[in-house]
Amino acid sequence: ANSASLTFGEPAFLGRDLNARIELFYRTTSYDQADYNTRSIGIAPSLSFPISENGRLTLSYRLAEDRIFDVTASSSPILRRDDGTAITSALGYSYTYDNRRSGLDINSGVVLRFGQDFAGLGGDITNVETTALAGYQTQVYNEEITLRATIEGGAVNSLDGQNTRITDRYFLSSRQMRGFEPLGLGPRDLAAPNQDAL
């Protein structure tokens, strides 16, 4: 997988505690373990602001062109159906509560995050993506060692009765689940000759 992005950020937009960002991105995948390739190109502006002492709300928009190509004849019909290009136009929000640097105990704290993206404002994709994250951090042995634990989950629900595309689904990376090759963990179509990850 390869990716390149260019991000412009202004942490004090309009002279206030408003974090304005705009990201231009280009990502490709070409795994030896998969008989298809992907390319995604797009733009994603966002605006983040505090709504409490430890809470911030982020409002975002994403416009992306996702292309799936080089799908082989031995791939699952699920993958062959996704072959081609689709435009995603999505509005989203994310709320983050983080007291790791401002809580009563300066050596420990939590971070909680919940967000949703609503695709369907134009484009070809109509779905809702919901994500949640919870993390805990503490320092031990005279603050010489930092321990962190994080749990994260998400779901993508189609709003028009169509199946989600492979570019909209989740894949665990080697940072999240060690001991597996790229695309080595996840659902498969066992009836397909190559049994590619779906």
Model-predicted segments: where are they?
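C-terminal outer-membrane beta-barrel translocator/porin domains of Gram-negative envelope proteins
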Residues: A1, S60-L198
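Transmembrane beta-barrel wall of Gram-negative outer-membrane proteins
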Residues: N2-T85
